[in-house]
Amino acid sequence: MLYSILCYDCESEVFSMTKEEDGELMARLSTVTARQEAAGKLGPRLRLMATTAATTVRSGGEVIDGPFAETKEQLLGFYIVDCESQEEAVETARRLAREKTNGTLEVRPVLWFDPGTSLK
């Protein structure tokens, strides 16, 4: 079954990291995802730009500059993993969390998934 691991963090802390600090963090996270990738269980993963680059479109078509949610932690990225159980997905999130200094990872089963076309 597919699970999403949603990555929430304090945007100002994440985007204030130096290039070296960010590179070290991504390298640590890659050691975790390498295991999933080798097993053919790692799907798309991404990091979003800052919410200052966001535009919100409400139902009906109203467009608002910036993010809708005004919270300390923002959704900054996600992983899609193929796991046998919720427990396996949670364990994957635990391994990722051990490599982070703060933030929250939310594990949620995927109800519908369309990989779309290959983007480059």
Where does each model-flagged region fall?
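Conserved, structured core segments of small domains
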Residues: 1-120
